[in-house]
Design a protein with these regions (language model features):
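Short beta-strand/loop motif that positions the catalytic acidic residue
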Residues: 360, 365-372
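Accessory cap/linker subdomain of secreted extracellular hydrolases
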Residues: 257-357
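Alpha/beta-hydrolase active-site loop
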Residues: 170, 191-212
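C-terminal catalytic histidine-bearing segment of alpha/beta-hydrolase fold enzymes
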Residues: 347-348, 389-446
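Primarily recognizes the serine-hydrolase "nucleophile elbow" in alpha/beta-hydrolase
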Residues: 206-276
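Catalytic-loop region of hydrolases
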Residues: 39-114, 118
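Short, surface-exposed "cap/lid" segments of acyl-processing enzymes
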Residues: 96-104, 108-171
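Short alpha-helix in the alpha/beta-hydrolase fold that links the catalytic acid
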Residues: 362-363, 376-387
Length: 446
């Protein structure tokens, strides 16, 4: 293992034309989402028949269960809008215990030429946190950029993956964005569950290949930030055993949720502190032995709040539960994260869901903001160190954006996403190099 320190001399800028596409599309999508914040999309929010799985779910992971044409937000730097047709997709994946389950997502086929080297690839995107309610599913907000509902109560969810989807579509790649298990479809969304999120990403790649009429030899890359960064990191390390046939070339795991315990401690009392409820609810769904232990330490208000959060979207926790401190949910005023750390019943769950225990077989770029106030820098760096110690090929880049309004998430968590994902020296370059067959060098820690 060769671990280096300092900037990687092999990093290069994207070609000017590709940089222009990436920057223009990212800005246009962000502006479009801002414009539609005044619009309501009741139809998009209603799960409807499409999101209801059949009585018998095909057992084979990656099986396409059904598709449905869908429109896409057209506010892009082109009169033609998006360069490919899009579909809602439902496909088979596996729960933590191996049981088949239906998961939905968005598939965007490519129409224009592939602007990178080699054959046209598939890009599977692990989305960032959208919430835990069915209406929070990312696929329900691709038409408008945002979903606003008023029944039974006001709710808001934005599609954070419009920029990434649009950029890769403009470059000529096929794109699949998974909704994850339990978002849109029945059951609890198992937020930050390493195993189930990895399954959804890997089986999404299998389903995308089927829709494209291509085989597993199709070049594949993973892209994700925050919750999505953790999801694709987990997918990268599980791919050799779970989906060895896939031709994975590389992964960008930006600001990855790798150590759930560290995340719970960091966001407690922050603007999106309510996301702790997503994590607790997901744990209880897969580790029922935890329920009695959590009930013992939570007050009635705490239990009611956790139940309400199970149907909330990311916008809701900002408007209804801003800067939530979980000490307000417990009998003794101690944070829920501290209680979890002390519970013998929680130890297996927190260990199971930690990313970094396996070894990815293909190169991974990890980026993290030193001053990220939502997903701690140290646990992202630890993931890189863990993988490097196992002989993986990893590049770790530190984003030095200074602290701006600490605890409010947007500057110091989403700022590095835009810089590292779409800036002049970015994750797109890294993945294009992998698709072009350029070798990555050992372990580089920046």
């Amino acid at each position: 293992m060769d671990q280096q320190h300092g900037r990687n001399p092999r990093r290069r800028l994207l070609p000017r034309g590709v940089r222009t596409i990436a920057a223009a599309v990212a800005v246009a999508c962000a502006a479009a989402v801002a414009v539609v914040t005044t619009q309501q999309s009741e139809a998009a929010a209603a799960p409807g028949e499409f999101y209801s799985p059949p009585a018998q779910i095909p057992a084979e992971p990656g099986t396409v269960i059904r598709t449905q044409p869908m429109s896409l937000l057209a506010t892009l730097p082109s009169e033609q809008g998006w360069p490919g047709k899009a579909e809602h997709i439902m496909y088979t994946t596996r729960m933590q215990d191996g049981s088949p389950v239906a998961v939905t997502g968005t598939y965007i086929d490519a129409a224009g030429p592939w602007l990178g080297a080699g054959p046209r690839p598939t890009v599977v995107i692990g989305p960032g946190t959208s919430g835990q309610g069915d209406r929070c599913a990312m696929s329900q907000a691709f038409s408008t950029g945002i979903t606003i509902t008023t029944d039974p109560s006001p709710s808001l969810s934005a599609n954070q993956e419009l920029p990434s989807s649009a950029v890769w579509s403009r470059l000529g790649a096929r794109v699949l964005v998974t909704d994850y298990i339990g978002l849109g479809t029945p059951g609890v969304h198992t937020y930050a569950n390493r195993i189930e999120e990895a399954h959804a990403v890997l089986d999404g790649a299998r389903a995308a290949n089927k829709l494209a009429g291509t085989g597993p030899e199709t070049p594949l890359v993973f892209w994700g930030y925050s919750q999505g960064g953790g999801a694709v990191a987990a997918a990268a390390e599980m791919q050799p055993d779970y989906a060895p046939e896939l031709n994975l070339k590389g992964t960008w795991a930006g600001g990855p949720v790798a150590d759930l315990a560290a995340i719970l401690e960091r966001i407690d009392g922050a603007l999106i502190g309510g996301a702790i409820g997503f994590a607790i609810n997901g744990l209880l769904a897969r580790y029922p032995d935890l329920e009695k232990a959590v009930d013992r330490v939570t007050s009635q208000y705490g239990r009611d709040t956790l139940a309400a959060l199970s149907d909330a979207c990311i916008g809701d926790i900002i408007t209804r539960y801003p800067f939530l401190k979980t000490s307000s949910l417990t009998h003794d005023g101690q944070p829920l994260g501290a209680h979890l750390q002390a519970m013998p019943e929680a130890a297996p769950a927190l260990a199971d869901l930690r990313v970094g225990t396996l070894t990815p077989a293909t190169p991974v770029l990890i980026t993290s903001g030193r001053n990220d106030d939502t997903v701690p820098y140290n646990q992202a760096r630890q993931l890189a160190d863990d993988w490097c110690a196992k002989g993986a090929t990893v590049e770790f880049r530190t984003n030095e954006l200074p602290p701006l309004l600490p605890g409010t998430t947007i500057p110091n968590h989403f700022g590095p996403e835009m810089i590292d994902g779409f800036g002049p020296d970015n994750a797109i370059t890294y993945l294009l190099d992998r698709l072009a067959g350029k070798p990555a060098q050992g372990c580089t820690i920046d």
